[in-house]
Amino acid sequence: RTVSAKMLGTVLHLMQGTPYIYQGEELGMTNVFFDDVKDYNDLEIHDSWRKYVEESGRVSAEDMLRYISASGRDNARTPMQWDDSANGGFTNAGVEPWLKVNPNYPQINAQAALDDQDSVFYHYRDLISLRREHPIVLTGEYRLLDEEDEQVYAYLRVNSDEDAAATGERALLVVANFTDDTVQLNYAGGNLDSVVLTNSQALS
């Protein structure tokens, strides 16, 4: 989870445009899976449940819950997980929030992230610093590399000659391996000045 969250954050935050950090992604918070549809509040979920599970029987309760977990809106609307206290520190014990707190809050919460120097939170902080310190993230043209590659998503941010002369930065290479497999790549012909950020110590 941690390595994947760092990778996804890196891919998004080093692209062109204005990035935003939304609803606990800087902690690596995950979608929730409730085993009772009553725990969801989204009206579309309850409408679909009534149509396809209760009335027509076209979809089993188990399959619908899996679908909701993957595609529903409430799965990412759970309360912010601040610490491992009751309700994840979002509200006092005995107070019922609009949605239940994700049951994984004892492990995934802001306090735990602050206590772990290798957490998703600190990677996001590094991403923000990188954007501030390297103008190419703001000015560089986006160039997708090898769009046929089904394992690796890689792109360049490339400065114009004028911006490169002003900043000393010609190109920034971003590589994201979406698999568990080790891959060998040679996008830059071996000509890399430095690695500015990585989510894995296995990089070589």
Language-model features, listed with the residues they occupy:
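Active-site and adjacent substrate-binding regions of carbohydrate-active enzymes
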Residues: 1-204
